[in-house]
A protein has these predicted regions:
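ATP-dependent adenylation/nucleotidyltransferase module used to activate substrates
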Residues: 1-158
Length: 159
């Protein structure tokens, strides 16, 4: 990251509570920046027996934001996830396809619903995806990463 390029930008970090997005917050903090952090909630309001609990993820995201002096806001995108990702995935599986729900979640929820609700107020939105960008002819492009094992540009392919 080039500090001169981002120091005056309003930055949002999508903080999942995992290692990768936590490192993003650490990297910004090491540059003296304190982005606003957002935890995207995609689980239902009530605990369901089939639901993956996000409680620990939210606790970790809260701890990371607090450690680096960043604000953390929970953004409820359960409805959007269910109607746009889960339903789409089920329809495609029924039709004999093997969709990738993570790709759809990134496009429709992380960079779709989040952007409509809050992200449009920010100059930059950072995630913990392992990817690179490259400047070509004055435009920034998503490019593959040097480590093919960690490579995650496929998850960002449709944004």
């Amino acid at each position: 990251m080039d500090l001169a390029e981002i120091k005056d930008k309003k930055i949002a970090v999508l903080l999942s509570g995992g290692v990768d997005s936590s490192v993003v917050v650490h990297e910004f903090a090491s540059l003296g920046l304190h982005p606003d952090c957002f935890y995207i909630k995609i689980g239902p309001e009530e605990q369901e027996e089939w639901d993956c609990s996000s409680e620990e993820d939210l606790e970790m995201a809260t701890a990371v934001a607090h450690k680096y002096g960043c604000k953390l806001q929970v953004v409820d995108c359960h409805k959007e996830y269910w109607t746009q990702v889960t339903r789409y995935t089920m329809e495609k599986v029924k039709a004999g396809f093997t969709p990738n729900p993570d790709v759809m979640c990134n496009r429709l929820v992380k960079f779709g619903a989040f952007n409509e609700k809050i992200g449009h107020n920010y100059d930059l939105i950072a995630t913990g995806h392992y990817a690179q960008t490259e400047c070509i002819d004055g435009k920034k492009w998503l490019t593959t990463s040097p480590d093919p094992v960690k490579e995650q540009t496929d998850f960002l392919a449709q944004i």
